Swiss-Prot record:
Belongs to the universal ribosomal protein uL30 family. Keywords: Ribonucleoprotein, Ribosomal protein. GO terms for molecular function: structural constituent of ribosome. This is Large ribosomal subunit protein uL30. It comes from the Bacteria.
Length: 60
């Protein structure tokens, strides 16, 4: 699982549970359509799994 992941926030934070918002902030996603690069590791994969319905992930 070496490499990085490009994660893009595709849905807004309004009306979301505080745990979801906290997970997105820990990934660095605070605004709609913002893209961040994170290392491909189990911790990041777990956070992505929790918010999979709101983000788009590209391996790269």
């Amino acid at each position: 699982m070496a490499g990085t992941l490009k994660i893009t926030l595709k849905k807004g934070l309004a009306g979301r549970d505080q745990r979801i918002i906290a997970t997105l902030k820990s990934l660095g996603l605070t605004k709609l359509n913002k893209t961040v690069e994170r290392p491909d590791n189990p911790a990041v994969r777990g956070m992505i799994a929790r918010v999979a319905h709101m983000v788009e992930v590209q391996e790269g």
